[in-house]
Design a protein with these regions (language model features):
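Non-catalytic C-terminal accessory/binding modules of secreted extracellular proteins
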Residues: 2-142
Length: 142
């Protein structure tokens, strides 16, 4: 399969109802995938500790969020600290991309990584993650 790459500019869900992207692992639909969402500390999200790209790892093969190593729905925290899973805090400025750590990519070898819960490669890579006003830009390879 040839890798496909495309660039996106995401508005907030409040401003752009179609502003959430689903990125399938392996480029084909299945029970494990990523959702990309622009979250800004304004409006209904004014209490967020930071703004940027939320990368959600979804695994519909899981029934709940009781296994902190393989949640049904888990936020891939840009800082890689896993503070949410370890109940260290309720979120911090390093959780969304690029975040306080200025992390502009997410892939199989990054921390956190885009690997599947079984450790296999998903083929998903995000690069060029940046913020411009209330929008988030990202290039997606799948």
């Amino acid at each position: 399969m040839t890798a496909k790459s495309a660039s996106y500019t995401l508005g907030t869900l409040e401003a752009d109802a179609g502003g959430c992207l689903r990125v399938w692992t392996g480029g084909a639909s299945g029970p494990e995938y990523f959702l990309l969402e622009n979250r800004q500390a304004s409006g209904r999200d004014a209490s967020l500790p930071g703004s940027g790209l939320a990368v959600w790892h979804i695994d519909e093969q899981r029934s709940d969020n009781t296994n902190p190593l393989a949640y049904l729905v888990g936020l891939m925290q840009a800082d890689g600290k896993r503070d949410l899973e370890l109940a260290r805090n309720g979120g911090d400025p390093g959780d969304l991309f690029p975040g306080s750590g200025k992390k502009t990519s997410f892939h199989d070898k990054s921390s956190p990584s885009s690997r599947a819960h079984d450790g296999g490669s998903t083929g998903v890579a995000l690069s060029g993650i940046s913020q411009a006003k209330n929008a988030v830009k990202v290039t997606v390879k799948r």
